[in-house]
Amino acid sequence: MTTTWKEEIEGEMEFYGESLSDIISSTMSEDQMNIEFNNSMNAVLEGIPFTIWTESRVYFPVTYDTGEWCGSVSRNPDGKPTAHIGGG
């Protein structure tokens, strides 16, 4: 399946009540966010690495069996454990 980091990031942000307008800092340019890549399992890793910060979360790429998507954690200590990222 073809996607962009913008689509993947927006989906993760929406889950936490955020949007792209909440970004404080990003290691990716807007052009890089819009590059299409194949995020299917057993495909070649194609998405570029990134880190994005908002007031409340930090967003980053996650991979499992070469499937790629966006994950995030709280920017500040919240007492909630982080589940294993990238696998079942």
Where is each model-derived feature located?
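Acidic interaction surfaces
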Residues: 1-88
